[in-house]
Amino acid sequence: MNSSKTSLDAKITDITKKLEALNKEYADSVKKSDELSKLLSKENDNSPASQEAAARHILELKDDLENELENAKLDDISAPTAEQSKKISEIYGKYIEKISKINDASLTSDSLAWKYAIKYDWEIAKGHHDNQLRLLNPTFFYGNASVYPMNAFSNQYGKYGQLPYKQLLANFKEAVQHKIVMSKVYSKMVVNAFVGRLFQEELTKFVEDKSKNEISVADLIESSSLEGNWKEFLKYYATTYYNAATHGLGEDIKELKLYKENKTNEKELSIDARDKGGKIVKLYGLGLTEKDLNQRNVGLGFAEGDATVNGQSMYRQILKMATTSDLTDDQVNNIGYETTKKSAENSKKIANQAADLIVGKGKKWEAKIKYDADGIGPEEIKEETVVIRDEKGNIDIPSFTKWLNDEEFFFGREGSAYWTDTIKNGLKTDPNLKKYVGELTKFDYDQLLTKGNKDAKHGSITNEEFYYGGLSAFKAYEQFKKTTQNYGRKFFANEVPDYDIQTYKFNEREFVGVGAYNSGIKKFMFNVDPYFSLPKWSVTSFANHESMMGHHNQLMYAQKYLSSVGEFGKYKLGNVFHYTSYVEGWALFMEWFGIEAGFYGTPDYDNKDGDLYAMPVDFSTAHGITNFFTAKTEAEVTDDMIQQIKDLHNGVYWNKVAQVNKYENQDKKHAMDAVKLANLLQYQGALNEAQLRNMRLALDTAYHGKGVKGHEDLPAGASINQVREFMKKNSSLGIGDITSESRRYLSYVGQATSYNSGKAVMMDLYTKVQKKLGLTRREFVEKDNHKYVKEFFDALLRNSALPMDALIKSVSAKYGLTVEKK
């Protein structure tokens, strides 16, 4: 009896607790409803309590959406079905309507950023599913802001290996039915990439099999130990999917095969395999031929599609995600084209300054150079004489571009005479480079030094020169870090952890471009291959973009110093946004700020045109890679200063400035002029990198935008070769950079358009805030220990990588700027 009573009492107690919990939940919901009604009313105040309630409601809506997706088992789907995409779109649509009702009057500058960034993120996600991007098997696993078609550029194959292969395969089969198939040129590059990355063991077996001179890609995949469904997916892609293309056919091979001889006369992207002894062996069949390089209409926008979906609508969705704007493909193309043409004139001013340094004020500049017209291609280096400035003072930009691409301006391509045993041993035994020697070993570059490989040709140099050129590039980027990092930190209110430097795996280097920043390991990555790396005069702008103050600073800031709302930081959104237009826009913004901060010389803050990229007024001293040189007169030049400029970047500036004036017994004068040339050319690198991003807007859309009208020198549906020709004529980029970048824009659909989109917004905000504060440009940078620029940078950084509209609203609210209505 007592036992039964005890059991009954326990049940009553339990029921009572549940009723109390339900009553509390009801009371809370009534309170939340009252707060919500107040938030949505136009009469609500902007009190701290109201601000907290609004911030909480934004976060609750975000949580509610995520919970609804999770409960429907739709929260972590990287290969959705048609039905799943439809349901996901409906859920996003419902919550977009809810968050839109929150009244901005209750929001702080931070919660305003949260509201509009979340809303935009949901709109982008809905657009991905409404436009059936699932048929491209894109990178859903990277989040709404980074959904790009399966491609040859980003190293995603390990990630794909963890996905549901059956659904990936089903999506591609459905894509074939809808005629949403990437071009043969595009798809062959994808096959090339995954064969080179996933099947090295099988390639070695093929190399060693003397009875075979060819093998089909399907048979190569079949011979591997990959899991069965993964195997079937890759085989389908390399056979049925590849052959279903109706545009951009190029060589139009019916069965993709690998050959031991170059039967298809391919020009580039031959696969590097190895025999059992480690010797590099070229395999052919998956590289690019002349037909591939000249093929028009190879981009996504030209995928035929049907009544329900087409490549053009898919590209426009990706473009909206990348630029965080509603600009059409034709509008983006025109912006890129016009800014490219306008900026090309800047090089003339730099060429004149360089001419004055090297040959004298106003004199004719004729230079002998060693020039490799096709980079990694079969053509040999040629000695040429170029007239950069004639007797009348006219500058010839193509000749100046050739001079800037002289072999000596590339690490590893200085010529065999440079690579003495003393130089090589000095690099190998330098204690500051010990860890980088280890990096080269770890990523499989030691094979370049083996007896059978070291004297073999790599382009126009040897494999050994390739290796030591890579090691000397490590030295240069380490020197950049040591000379600029502490100065760069002065412009930020919060300090971030240090970064390190790394390269890529040997068998990935042809696909990865010149470099990137890896936030997971806090490392600035660069390509050590002398034919896929940037010239020496781009070291500052490139390294600043990727490291301190660029990507590294922004991404580490997002991990440590994000905003909050309420007392004691009660409400925090966290690091949830990763929009490329912001991430790359910030890095480009910092490239520009290097000019404003004096990395290249004394900034021209007072130029009459208001040109933010204006040439520094004096290149004698700088805060960048030559900040070891503080001398204003020859008497102040020390032996250590002379030695450092002699060694900088393998002596290229010391050598180039002495083309005419040999500086006999004038080492101090020689050093001063070499430093000026180094700073001048690093500034040229900054302008050239800015020009590269101008071109990216035009080139990505020229490849993929079916709605683009085009231009005489850059037509719509441009071929790879047409893109390269445009880059040659409108920049100082090296042939290796042009080669890798032109492949990248075709492969990484839409991504290249993100860079300038974000930078333009940030530079516009910079100028508006400076003027709103009533400060000159110099005061904005320098006054009160950089106080004002620190506060502005914090306003940009404190809410992670926002869509541009949200960033504009947030910064404008903080500084009282007027937001222009769309």
Mark where each language-model region is.
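N-terminal maturation segment of proteins
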Residues: 3-822
